[in-house]
Amino acid sequence: VQTIVDDLQSHFWHEQAHVVCNSFGSYLFLHAQAKMPSFIGRVLLLSPIVGEFTSEQTRTSFSPPRPDRLKTLAESGQFNAPVNCDIHVGEEDWQSIPTNVQAFGCLTGIPVTVVPNAGHDLGKAYVGPLLDRWLAN
């Protein structure tokens, strides 16, 4: 996480910077963000992991390092959200869990788009045009 902090602050700390993170990469970015002032570039988080998850349907669970840290910081108002950030998560995503992502977004002021009929892989048909629009702004 410290390497991400160092890279962002050394090479990408400007308003024209674009950072795109997917899944666990979003988790790493958010933990790096927790150690910095609000990132001033643009950030797009796709299917972000925001804590631990369990799926009884697939009999799978995952608990990343420090699984409650982001929630704790957000609930206490101590999470410095990026200045310009958007989150997209599939409504059927059992790894990112849309309700958890939406709760995190509400606590941090980060807008969350829930993609209908999509899982953890949002798919090229959705992400391609999203990136085209996002990069054009």
Which residues does each predicted region cover?
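Hydrolases whose catalytic domains are alpha/beta-hydrolase-1, hotdog thioesterase
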Residues: 28-32, 54
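Catalytic histidine-centered segment of alpha/beta-hydrolase-like enzymes
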Residues: 118-129
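Gly/Ala-rich beta-loop-alpha elbow adjacent to hydrolase catalytic centers
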Residues: 20-29
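Residue in the alpha/beta-hydrolase core beta-strand immediately N-terminal to the catalytic nucleophile
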Residues: 17-18, 42-44
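Short beta-strand/loop motif that positions the catalytic acidic residue
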Residues: 81-82, 86-89
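Active-site nucleophile loop of the alpha/beta-hydrolase fold
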Residues: 44-53
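Alpha/beta-hydrolase active-site loop
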Residues: 1-11
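Conserved alpha/beta-hydrolase "acid-adjacent" motif
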Residues: 94-100, 123
